[in-house]
Amino acid sequence: MRLTRRNLLGAAMAASLAVAAPAFAAKPLTIGFSQVGAESEWRTANTASIKDAARKAGVNLKFADAQQRQENQVKAIRSFIAQRVDVIAFSPVVESGWDTVLREAKAAKIPVILTDRAVKVSDPSLYVSFIGSDFVEEGRRAARWLVEHAKKNPARSYNIVELQGTVGSAPALDRKAGFAEVIAGNPKLKIIRSQTGDFTRAKGKEVMEAFLKSEG
């Protein structure tokens, strides 16, 4: 079966059931999920798929919208710990700064699952599973396409403007790294401007219009 980023979240719910202790089998499983926000149509569909997967699995879902703020996710995770949920899952706003709250979840013996985005922590045992994409490879693929396209006109050089996602998020960091890796050493491909669009249509449009005005 071909897994998309949307139905991988359904798999996350299945994974949650798998990591929960058998003792929970006699009662509905309770999962606390902290979503990044509702910054795009994709994220809205992502949230809908999570809620649908929980309903179909008979899971009691406690849902929290972080509104793209890490501090809101930390508060939500601590609330889930206080409520003694069986599993915590979240799609992290940014990549770093999670060690303390994840240690609290581990101390409470509540397994944590990362969905869509990864984190950087000092101890990998602070979460039990990551279900998501290889964002570095996504960046490489975009760059490979550009490299192949550039070969059609070898006499031309290309100035690149880069529209990034949320500052500090795994997708933004990793896609940039993968893209830069492939174009490194190619003198005909040069990134001249780079700015965040916060993964929103409105901000992305605003930034791209500014790019076109200043560089177009």
Describe the role of every protein-language-model region.
Residues 2-3, 24-216:
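A residue-level marker of the well-folded mature domains of exported/periplasmic proteins
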Residues 5-9:
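N-terminal export leaders
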Residues 10-15:
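Sec-dependent N-terminal signal peptides
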Residues 20-22:
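N-terminal signal peptide c-region/cleavage motif recognized by signal peptidases
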